[in-house]
Amino acid sequence: MDFKPMFPSLNVLWTRWSAYQIKPHQWGGEYLIPAEGATDLTYNCAEQPGPLVADALELGQQLHMGAPDKNRLCAAFAARYGLLGLNAEKGEGATEDPNVPPCYRPLNSWEYGEDVSFFQSNFVMLYQHFLTVQGELVPTPNPRVMDLSGFLSYRLTSGPNPQLVWEVRSLESVIRFAYASMISAESIPLKVCKNCGKVYYNTHAKSEFCGTKCRNYYNVKVFREKDRISHPD
């Protein structure tokens, strides 16, 4: 499957802030929220699904491996793409009450935030699913524990020429649906760099490296290893 034919003309306007921070809340937990002085930008988060999914998997990989700077990595991802909108597809209402946790404030407003543990777990689950596809992780005892699921809303217009309109309401759904279309494609465009191990997006079937630097570094490394074997001390 391909994301574009599945969701033609999909336009999901999403608001991100230029910087995020993690702060504890009086009711418990830590929340990823816009930083003081941050500015907002609204964009179509479904416009470039390839880099988006690759970056989501890369963050999931870092979190899965226990990166020491995981909070900084999450804040950087949010600054680039925005928060996930974890409750948006469920249609849960927002409130102006300043005493409630940030996740219940108006979506993507300056007061809105997401529990950092829930935020991180979404990326870890996505990456672990990718590992099962790669054959590097076998879920036991129940294979379905690694399955991914989500909400898919639509609207069918009335009249002589009805149109099917997908109503995707969150960045989380865009990531999940884009990933699903890519990972189930005949030629999977999500790859792991042969040199650095980074997950990247490339539609060329024979692509093995995330960039020229890694390709050159790997070739030099292979050349030196062959030279060492051919000319032992």
Where do the model's predicted regions map?
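Short metal-binding segments enriched for Cys and/or His
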Residues: 219-229
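Flexible domain-boundary/linker segments
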Residues: 210-213, 227, 231
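Cysteine-rich micro-motifs
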Residues: 203-217
